[in-house]
A protein has these predicted regions:
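A short helix-breaking turn/cap at a secondary-structure junction
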Residues: 177-258, 263, 321, 325
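Gly/Ser-rich catalytic/binding loops embedded in alpha/beta enzyme cores
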Residues: 1-160, 262-270
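Residue-level signal for inorganic ion chemistry
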Residues: 19, 40, 89, 208, ...
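Short, well-ordered beta-strand elements within core beta-sheets of diverse protein domains
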Residues: 3-10, 62, 80-84, 196-203, ...
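Acyltransferase
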Residues: 13-16, 45-48, 252-278, 310-311, ...
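Short alpha-helical scaffolding segments that buttress acidic/His motifs in well-ordered protein cores
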Residues: 15-19, 288-289, 335-343
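Short glycine/serine-rich loop segments
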Residues: 89-90, 94-215, 412-423, 430-433
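Glycine-rich, small-residue loops and helix-cap segments
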Residues: 58, 152, 274, 296, ...
């Protein structure tokens, strides 16, 4: 099943040139914001000369354009960082390059990763790999599309509330949000520091596992990282999986529900018992998320002021005007909306009523997950209520857009690993994914489970 293995042992220069050729062939999807051609070919020549080696020697990959990486600007798909060239690389990128992998480009996203469709990019929306009239999902839409269209065998993304899992589902690839702290966030543009995670897309679980194993582990530059646990996880022993009943109601598209049930049948064939379970705090998770995350991102985005770095407004007369105009010109509408929400819930009059209450509710959600994992190896649910929607369909309705995250934010708030796995296509040919959520530090076991289903 591995596609990465197809690149191993071949000419790295040929691998890179083929990836660049494919990237140019799919320009109409607007999945890539830049190519790192010059640097990629330089590294490829060193691989072929034996100067660079490793488990991924000569394998091309793409990073979401909120990862700092050499060879092209890091824009976060925003005007604010349009011409920003990073002085360093993200730890995740460094680890992959240390194993010989070659970054060939940077993928489109919702600006600053604020969105669920990759429509909120300053450089235009990314189109779905299966249907160019539909969204790619977000915020890591570009990374999902280049993986689905075989530009590269894997691509990196970030997942704060579903930003890997949802585009993976919409484009028919595997995507993982790891345990919080599994992979260093150093060198990645911060969104919400308590839920940001680094993951990847691939066409199969085996490749996903390899990439994550390489990236995982302690990093002194990110104090939230965990000691490497990737290959030290106890096997699933309960042989029971919980099907979350809140996700199987009439509010969820009928085809999505059926594909989830079909996936459950495959798990039964592997010897797992499937039982319906109650995740009652899920109904409050979206409200928690859209209080906690905007609060954190409004603080993280305060650094973009037109003084230290980023877009700077021209012809200003006062410092206040410089701050105001630089941020107004550099941020997209969705960025401003989330900053305003975050500033509101952190204000002195509402901090206790909103932010602190959301954090208390978050603890209850975590406790509910903990209780379920005393009985079940994993939880099964859809990734999103529907397959990919039309470009522009939800663009003017932020609440409807936020509701698409209802099934992905619970695992994010709890810091749990979750994998989006392809489950087939709708009658219209649109990919549908299912989500497997595991207990803390059970990431590899989830991918092993997906791999076993892939073989059925």
């Amino acid at each position: 099943m591995s596609k990465i293995s197809d690149f191993i042992g071949k000419s790295a220069v040929e691998n890179v040139n083929e990836a660049l050729r494919r990237a140019r062939e799919i320009e109409e999807y607007n999945a890539l914001l830049s190519l790192t051609e010059e640097r990629a070919l330089e590294r490829a020549e060193k691989v072929d000369a034996g100067e660079i080696s490793g488990r991924l020697a000569g394998v091309p990959f793409v990073v979401k354009d909120n990862f700092l990486a050499f060879g092209a600007p890091t824009t976060a798909a925003s005007k604010m960082l349009e011409n920003f060239n990073a002085p360093l690389q993200a730890t995740a990128v460094e680890k992959l390059e240390a194993e010989g992998a070659i970054c060939v480009g940077k993928a489109n996203l919702d600006a600053f990763a604020h969105g669920g469709s990759t429509e909120n990019s300053a450089f235009g929306p990314t189109k779905n790999a299966a249907d160019k009239t539909r969204v790619a999902g977000g915020s890591s839409g570009g990374s999902a599309v280049v993986t689905a269209l075989d530009v590269v065998p894997f691509a990196l993304g970030t997942d704060t509330g579903g930003s890997i899992r949802q585009p993976a589902s919409f484009n028919g690839v595997v995507g993982i949000k790891p345990t919080y702290g599994a992979v260093s966030r150093y060198g990645v543009v911060a969104m919400a520091s308590s839920t940001d995670t680094i993951g990847c897309f691939a066409t199969n679980a085996e490749d996903t596992d390899l990439v994550m194993e390489i990236m995982a582990g302690r990093d002194d530059k990110d104090m939230t990282t965990l000691p490497d646990f990737w290959n030290n996880q106890p096997e699933f022993a309960k042989k029971k999986i919980g099907l979350v009943k809140q996700c199987m109601t009439d509010d969820v598209d009928a085809e999505v529900r059926q594909k989830t049930l079909d996936y459950a049948e495959k798990l039964k064939r592997l010897g797992y018992e499937i039982e319906e379970v109650d995740l009652s705090m899920m109904q409050h998770s979206l409200a928690m998320y859209y209080i906690i995350v905007p609060a954190e991102l409004s603080s993280n985005l305060a650094r973009y002021d037109g003084v230290r770095y980023g877009h700077r407004a021209a012809e200003v007369k006062t410092l206040a005007e410089l701050y105001g105009r630089s941020r107004n010109e550099g941020f997209m509408t969705e960025n401003k909306r989330r900053i305003m929400i975050g500033s509101f819930v952190l204000s002195s009059g509402f901090f206790d009523a909103y932010y602190m209450q959301a954090q208390k509710a978050r603890t209850l959600l975590i406790d509910e997950f903990k209780k379920l994992f005393t009985e079940y190896d994993a939880l099964l649910m859809p990734v999103a209520p529907t397959p990919a929607f039309k470009i522009g369909e939800n663009a003017s309705d932020p609440i409807k857009m936020y509701l698409a995250d209802i099934m992905t934010v619970p695992a994010s708030l709890a810091g749990l690993p979750a994998v989006s796995a392809p489950a087939g296509n709708s009658d219209e040919g649109l990919p549908i994914g299912v989500q497997l959520i595991g207990d803390y530090k059970s990431d590899k076991n989830l991918l092993k489970l997906v791999s076993e289903v892939e073989e059925i």
